[in-house]
Amino acid sequence: MGKVYDWFEERLEIQAIADDITSKYVPPHVNIFYCLGGITLTCFLVQVATGFAMTFYYRPTVTEAFSSVQYIMTEVNFGWLVRSVHRWSASMMVLMMILHVFRVYLTGGFKNPRELTWITGVILAVLTVSFGVTGYSLPWDQIGYWAVKIVTGVPEAIPVIGSPLVELLRGSVSVGQSTLTRFYSLHTFVLPLLTAVFMLMHFLMIRKQGISGPL
């Protein structure tokens, strides 16, 4: 085992990386509320794992979406548990994100020189809400359908570009298969990719600048 470790150590300098991680200074004022961002990340990872598991059975069509969700809940081994954990962790992620934003704001963590960290955090908050909006529609039940119809109809109030925006979101003039396909693609590919990128940026900046001091 020692030879294997030495082989990797010689090439990757594992010990230096470990020392850098474990020796990072943590200010004495840090308390449990500073863990809210990490909890949000944990919820996101749970979302990725459970969401990926459900893609094996979910069918993103207006005729089969609801029945495929029913199949996951009633026929797939532990499917009910996977989907329930996905829903619970989604709610928890939104809650932890909101509390994290409040904590950062109230402790002044957005001030110089951490403005860019705050901006990436706000973008992540928008992405988190977008996850909720797109995921809510995927079962394609009555609640999901009408929620999509209302949400995608909001931009119509914008002068000049309102109607084109609505059509862009829906994929057509009315809510249908194109809308579900768009929301499924956003929920399972575009949003997770963007979230991973901005999370990496967010954590790298936190790592570089450290935790903000007390007010």
UniProtKB/Swiss-Prot annotation:
Q: Which cofactor does it need?
A: heme b; heme c
Subcellular locations according to the entry: Plastid, Chloroplast thylakoid membrane
MF term (GO), any: metal ion binding
Q: Which residues cross the membrane?
A: 32-52, 90-110, 116-136, 186-206
- What does UniProt give as GO cellular component? chloroplast thylakoid membrane
Membrane association type? Multi-pass membrane protein
Q: Which CDD domains match?
A: Cytochrome_b_N
Q: Which InterPro entries does UniProt cross-reference here? A: Cyt_b/b6_N, Cyt_B6_PetB, Cytb/b6-like_sf, Cytochrome_b_N_euk/bac, Di-haem_cyt_TM
The protein's matches in Pfam families, at most eight in alphabetical order, are given as: Cytochrome_B (PF00033)
State the free-text cofactor note.
Binds 2 heme b groups non-covalently with two histidine residues as axial ligands.
Chain residues that bind heme c: C35
Question: What keywords does the record list, in alphabetical order?
Answer: Chloroplast, Electron transport, Heme, Iron, Membrane, Metal-binding, Photosynthesis, Plastid, Thylakoid, Transmembrane, Transmembrane helix, Transport
> Which GO terms fall under biological process for this protein?
photosynthesis; respiratory electron transport chain
Binding-site residues, heme b 2: H86, H187
Q: Could you tell me what this protein does? A: Component of the cytochrome b6-f complex, which mediates electron transfer between photosystem II (PSII) and photosystem I (PSI), cyclic electron flow around PSI, and state transitions.
The record, for PANTHER family, names: CYTOCHROME B
Q: How does it assemble?
A: The 4 large subunits of the cytochrome b6-f complex are cytochrome b6, subunit IV (17 kDa polypeptide, PetD), cytochrome f and the Rieske protein, while the 4 small subunits are PetG, PetL, PetM and PetN. The complex functions as a dimer.
Q: What else is known?
A: Heme 1 (or BH or b566) is high-potential and absorbs at about 566 nm, and heme 2 (or BL or b562) is low-potential and absorbs at about 562 nm.
- The name on file for this protein is Cytochrome b6
